[in-house]
Amino acid sequence: MALRRSLAFVLMLSSLAGALPAAEPPPTATIPAVSLRPTDRFARLQWDATHAGTAPWGHWGDQPGHYISWSNHSNRLVPVYTFGIGLDGVAGEQSPYRSEDRLRAIYGRLPEHTLNPAADYFDQTDVHTLQVAAAAAGKRRIILMVFDGLDWTTTRTAAIALSGNVAYDSGRGTGLSFQDYAGAPTAFGFCCTSPANDGTKVDVDAQALKNPGGDKAGGYDVAMGGATPWDPIAQPTYLIGRDRYRPHAVCDSAASATAFCSGRKTYNDAINVDPAGKQVEPIARTLQKQGWAVGTVTSVPIPHATPACAYANNVSRDDYQDITRDMVGLRSVSHRGEPLPGLDVVIGCGFGGDAPDDSKQQGVNYEPGNKYVAPSTLAAIDAEKGGRYRIAQRTAGRKGAEVLAEGAAAAIAGGERLLGLFGTKPGNLPFATADGGYDPVLVSE
């Protein structure tokens, strides 16, 4: 019962990630023997669809004739599951999409075709509101989990695959652990993911915007995109910003995660920077000032947009080395004088992501070597060299879980912070298959 009272958990299914393009069929498509295991009953379906470029058994997304999900970032309404806190303060009658004044406050203007007096959906900035409310309610642990690219339709597909049963066609659903968990008070809703704008150009070295406001505004037309995630979609290309009659900005991971973590709509590519170029503070740093321990755990490179927005500031999501400096409490291009305090725990990927030169994206202070974590950063924070972080990283011949557990134990014993750096090419964790293995049908080279 103590855990139920003290924990707030927000599970965010995000529509942000694009999909792999359909593969061209090879001269002869022979499925690898490793994928023919009877425990992986979907391997043949996936292999045939990947190499034919189409799936006769079904589709979702904007291209029915292709084996592809949504082919771009999108503005789909995405599910939000909460545990330990409700949605009454942000959804339904409290939806900001029912109010002109609240829409102006969120977007900085009144977006065209966006006001909806009947909206049940809330805004992605309200995910920040929920975390603030959880802290104010006395919750001692707040967890925000983001599944980048997993929307309502793919969640339902996974539930069908797991259970072998089509159990629902609307609402929260059933069949997956987070849908059925009843160990704490729980709620279900969905939010709009539109950004403030797209097309803002930046100067990474100066940490300045060249054209505040960009060239394309955000917004959400319910008549085009639907009132719920399971509604039939009038115009699928609208949701990916490719409708000629309603051109609009679609959200990327940086703008969306800034909204989740700092409660501010912004331009695509921004890491906790508002549309005018002003830095904003994510809730992790706000709570850290109040004595909270804060951290981020990710299956992608540590400074990628979503984990970066938990803590850092930068005008560009691609300035990886500086973003990592913010996350571990070193001076950076965005905090040149007094560095940020740094996260207590940082666990993620990016190991081996070497690049001789990435200065075009990361600016004049780019260091050759790992493009995600600069060599000088690892040296400066290493507890064995007088730094504040116990470093656990991918080690040849060792299981990552064992290396990480040993590092965590050493950090606890020594009163140190923890950095876990793992991953495979191109920097992420390996893909897990439905049967628990690590031999996906489609492997990126």
What are these regions (language model features)?
Residues 139-153, 287, 421:
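Beta-strand elements within well-structured catalytic alpha/beta cores of enzymes
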Residues 25-85, 93-95, 154-445:
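Surface-exposed loop and adjacent secondary-structure segments within mature catalytic domains
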Residues 60, 70-136, 169, 316:
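Short coil-to-helix leader/linker segments, especially the first N-terminal amphipathic alpha-helix
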Residues 8-18:
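Bacterial N-terminal signal peptides
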Residues 1-8:
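Bacterial N-terminal signal peptides that target proteins for export
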Residues 135-140, 251-253:
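Short, surface-exposed loop/turn motifs at beta-strand boundaries within globular domains
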Residues 19-23:
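Boundary at the C-terminal end of the N-terminal hydrophobic targeting segment
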